[in-house]
Design a protein with these regions (language model features):
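Short beta-strand elements
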Residues: 89-94, 159-168
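Small-residue-enriched alpha-helical segments and adjacent helix-cap loops
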Residues: 1-110, 116, 135-136
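Generic secondary-structure signature for well-ordered alpha-helical cores
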Residues: 16, 20, 59-63, 119-122, ...
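Terminal amphipathic helices with adjacent charged low-complexity linkers/tails
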Residues: 4-11, 18, 214-227
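Flexible, glycine/charged-enriched surface loops at secondary-structure junctions
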Residues: 22-27, 64-70, 199-213, 229-237
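A hydrophobic, small-residue-rich beta->alpha segment in the mid-to-C-terminal subdomain
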Residues: 167-202
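Long C-terminal interaction/binding lobes of large macromolecular proteins
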Residues: 221-248
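Iron-sulfur cluster-binding cysteine motifs and their immediate structural context
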Residues: 110-132, 142-158
Length: 248
């Protein structure tokens, strides 16, 4: 029925010796959650490797950094988003952007690309040429290996990012940050995001509510610049969010 106060430190030492740690709650970066990534037939990125890297860099490395509230990171291997990255404070999912020139299309009577597109983003125009509606495309990459004449190539592979997802008593779907980001860009964005949240969030305020209060466009503009990195040490050293915040 609980651990007596005087046994807390011995308990921590005992489970640390077994390879476990305590302290996964409170106003801080939480343990990272991911899907199985490339083990799945739909997976575009190695989510487990990325999850481990983010875990070590931000959950362990920034474990003592106090934030206004919990900060959950979710990683999906593709746009199917089985673990619902958009409902996490910081969401990540794999992207494979198609590169296609309609002039390369042979006008096959039976288009193999249309058959595999889950978003109905591909269609045949009046001239019998396949077209891709970019407004419908979610960059799942299925089409890039579907054309029998290799008319569709991969323009870019990387990660999509969403900000400020909340689920529970109140809900907020994460806001998509424009662009597809490389591995290094992604890690930099996570770092800048945490710094901005620590600096500009109010104690007890969920990240998504901070983004809305600051202004989505304003926050994303700050996020995509490197100005906050010039204030990194100042932000980390500041006496912020010492009491209150997340209760679980």
């Amino acid at each position: 029925q609980g651990i007596p106060y005087e046994n807390i430190e011995p308990f921590n030492a005992a489970i640390e010796a077994a390879g476990y740690v305590t302290g996964g709650t409170g106003g801080k970066v939480r343990p990272v959650v991911c899907c199985k990534g490339t083990v799945c037939v739909h997976g575009l990125v190695d989510t487990r490797k990325l999850s481990q890297e983010i875990h070590e860099k931000f959950y362990i490395g920034w474990h003592e950094v106090r934030l206004p509230h919990k900060f959950k990171i979710g990683i999906g291997g593709c746009p199917n988003n089985c673990i619902k990255p958009q409902l996490n404070d910081f969401g990540i999912f794999g992207q494979k952007v198609p590169k296609y020139d309609p002039d390369d299309c042979n006008g096959c009577k039976k288009c193999s690309v249309i058959d595999v597109c889950p978003m109905n983003a591909c269609s045949i125009d009046d001239d019998g040429i396949m077209q891709i509606d970019k407004s419908l495309c979610n960059n799942c990459g299925k089409c890039t290996s579907a054309c029998n004449f290799d008319c569709i190539e991969v323009e870019k592979e990387g990660y999509a990012v969403t900000l400020g997802g909340i689920w529970g008593k109140t809900q907020r779907i994460g806001t998509r940050v424009p662009g597809v980001f490389t591995h290094d860009e992604l890690l930099s964005i996570i770092e800048k995001c945490i710094l901005l949240y620590r600096e500009q969030g109010k104690t007890g305020e969920r990240f998504g509510r901070s983004v809305d209060r600051i202004g989505v466009e304003n926050f994303i503009q700050q996020l995509l610049s490197d100005d906050v990195l010039d204030r990194k040490q100042e932000i980390l050293d500041a006496q912020l969010h010492l009491t209150g915040g997340a209760k679980c």
